[in-house]
Amino acid sequence: MAVQQNKKSPSKRGMHRSHDFLTNPALAVEPTTGEAHLRHHISPNGFYRGRKVVKAKGE
């Protein structure tokens, strides 16, 4: 079983965990409809970067 040689101080422990936090996903706003969507994904209306790329079910 692995055993550490020296105890890690609270400061070093905190530095080690500094990147473990979660971030909110980056949202983009569609210029044509104004809806928010995930970056690099199409909006719920089927628009991507100002162009209609997918037909909606009601169309």
From Swiss-Prot:
Residues in coiled coil: none
Organism: Thiobacillus denitrificans (strain ATCC 25259 / T1)
Molecular function in Gene Ontology: structural constituent of ribosome
Cleavable signal peptide: none
Keywords assigned: Ribonucleoprotein, Ribosomal protein
Any single Pfam family the record assigns to this protein: Ribosomal_L32p
Entry protein name: Large ribosomal subunit protein bL32
Recorded family membership: Belongs to the bacterial ribosomal protein bL32 family.
Highest taxon above the source species: Bacteria
One Gene Ontology term from the biological process aspect of the record: translation
An annotated GO cellular component: large ribosomal subunit
Keyword Ribosomal protein carried by entry: yes
PANTHER family: 50S RIBOSOMAL PROTEIN L32 (PTHR35534), LARGE RIBOSOMAL SUBUNIT PROTEIN BL32 (PTHR35534:SF1)
UniProt entry tagged with the keyword Cell cycle: no
UniProt-annotated stretches for the region Disordered: 1-22
Gene behind the chain: rpmF
